[in-house]
Each structure stands twice: as C-alpha cells, then as structure tokens.
C-alpha cells in the first residue's frame, strides 16, 4: 500500500473524507431530529 516511505502523514484524502462525512452526517442528524420532533408535536 505504502510504496514511498517519505510520504507525509497528513494527505489531502483525509480532508476530503472529513468533508464528505460531515456533509452527509450533519443534515442526517438534523433530519432525524426534525422527524422525532414532529412525532411529539403531532400527538
């Protein structure tokens, strides 16, 4: 996997992965929270 041993520990893939995870996770948590709130408001 790591052929070059002089490769730095901090590589751009980590930042792209962090961005993708937060772009998907934050609206999902907000959406689930909104649905849960709707269940309590309706009743």
Swiss-Prot record:
One Gene Ontology term of the molecular function aspect: electron transfer activity
| Summary of subunit composition and partner proteins | Heterodimer of an alpha subunit and a beta subunit. PSII is composed of 1 copy each of membrane proteins PsbA, PsbB, PsbC, PsbD, PsbE, PsbF, PsbH, PsbI, PsbJ, PsbK, PsbL, PsbM, PsbT, PsbX, PsbY, PsbZ, Psb30/Ycf12, peripheral proteins PsbO, CyanoQ (PsbQ), PsbU, PsbV and a large number of cofactors. It forms dimeric complexes.
- InterPro entries named in the record: PSII_cyt_b559_bsu, PSII_cyt_b559_CS, PSII_cyt_b559_N
Topology in membrane: Single-pass membrane protein
Which organism is this entry from?
Answer: Synechococcus sp. (strain JA-2-3B'a(2-13))
Q: Pfam family example for this protein?
A: Cytochrom_B559
Tell me, what does this protein do in biology?
This b-type cytochrome is tightly associated with the reaction center of photosystem II (PSII). PSII is a light-driven water:plastoquinone oxidoreductase that uses light energy to abstract electrons from H(2)O, generating O(2) and a proton gradient subsequently used for ATP formation. It consists of a core antenna complex that captures photons, and an electron transfer chain that converts photonic excitation into a charge separation.
Cell compartments where the protein resides: Cellular thylakoid membrane
> Taxonomically, what lineage is the organism?
Bacteria, Bacillati, Cyanobacteriota, Cyanophyceae, Synechococcales
Protein name (Swiss-Prot/TrEMBL): Cytochrome b559 subunit beta
GO terms (BP aspect)? photosynthetic electron transport chain
Transmembrane residues, as ranges?
18-34
Give the highest taxon in the source lineage.
Bacteria
Q: Which PROSITE patterns does this chain map to? A: CYTOCHROME_B559 (PS00537)
Chief place of localization: membrane
């Amino acid at each position: 996997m790591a052929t070059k041993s002089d490769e730095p520990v901090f590589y751009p893939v980590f930042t792209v992965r962090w961005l993708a995870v937060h772009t998907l996770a934050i609206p999902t948590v907000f959406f689930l929270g909104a649905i849960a709130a709707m269940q309590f408001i309706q009743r």
